From Swiss-Prot:
Record keywords: Cell inner membrane, Cell membrane, Ion channel, Ion transport, Membrane, Transmembrane, Transmembrane helix, Transport
Domain of life of the native organism: Bacteria
Membrane listed as a keyword: yes
Main localization, broad class: membrane
Membrane-topology descriptor: Multi-pass membrane protein
Record family assignment: Belongs to the MscL family.
InterPro entries named among the record's database cross-references: Mechanosensitive_channel_CS, MS_channel, MSC/AndL, MscL_channel
Source organism: Pseudomonas syringae pv. tomato (strain ATCC BAA-871 / DC3000)
The name this protein goes by in its record: Large-conductance mechanosensitive channel
Lineage: Bacteria, Pseudomonadati, Pseudomonadota, Gammaproteobacteria, Pseudomonadales
Amino acid sequence: MSVLTEFKAFAVKGNVVDMAVGIIIGAAFGKIVSSFVGDVIMPPLGLLIGGVDFSDLAVTLRPAQGTAPAVLLAYGKFIQTVIDFIIVAFAIFMGVKAINRLKREEAKAPTLPPTPSKQEVLLSEIRDLLKAQNTPAAPITVDPARTL
């Protein structure tokens, strides 16, 4: 089997395609959450704590010297990334929780045992009659009104 054929068989498998779709959707979802946090959550939060813009928070480790830029420890971006992570983790948690609830409800639904077919009922009756014949103390009774 050639490498190209093996790769084609690998790439077309359902799991690989599903994983690729999940990664692409996850990346797009990450962009949405980052925008939500940066554009919707952080501005009001900054106003509540005194007009601070988290993305600009930094500690200058070395000031700019001539053409060399300043060396900054940009902890504000880190805070924003942590908030992004918390929101994404919470959204995923809620999604998994909903899926698990649906699975539990599906598992709780009682399944009725299948009703036996006519053949199974007749075979059970024949079995019971044969057992009764092999037992000397039990009389054999046949219902003449019953027809096969």
